Amino acid sequence: EVYREYIYTGSPYISAMHLEGIEQNTVLIDSVSKRYSECGIRVGALITKNAEIRKAVMKFCQARLSPPLIGQIVAEASLDAPEEYYRDVYDEYVERRKCLIDGLNRIPGVYSPIPMGAFYTVAKLPIDDSDKFCRWCLEEFEYEGETVMMAPASGFYTTPGAGRNQVRMAYVLKKDDLNRALIVLAKALEAYPGRVEDEGL
């Protein structure tokens, strides 16, 4: 439930921990790095009413001993973030989301739904293989000395073949940088040798 502050539907956040009848099957995981935009801080929480899961997790915790000290210090300081921090970050993500989604959907052959939460989207591209495309962008493509880095969406699915023409893109950059990335992405799609026609999607 690490994205609970970033729900864009206007609906209230309801924790899975409050759903009746599934108590023994519910595991809540929280992360300081997601909630407070502190990339790399490996501090969080795992909460469950299932004693068997708690016992198994405790073994991993005892083997690890403790998270890095700096991460703990940063995490503790983050807990004191004022409420306006969340409002400001939320408002900024709403603007960045609009910038990225509108820009993606203007590129021929690209489609991105409007995410209802978090700070990333999964966009469908007119390409043969997202793993190949993402690697090609990093290793073989540049436009005016720049390229784009995306995550192949296939790694986020368990169904074989799912996400083969999708990429995950975060809108954590400033809007000017997102707009520039959209220009570079459009140029990459024009040049990519594995581009496919829309009907092949």
What residue spans do the PLM features occupy?
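PLP-dependent class I/II
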Residues: E1-L201
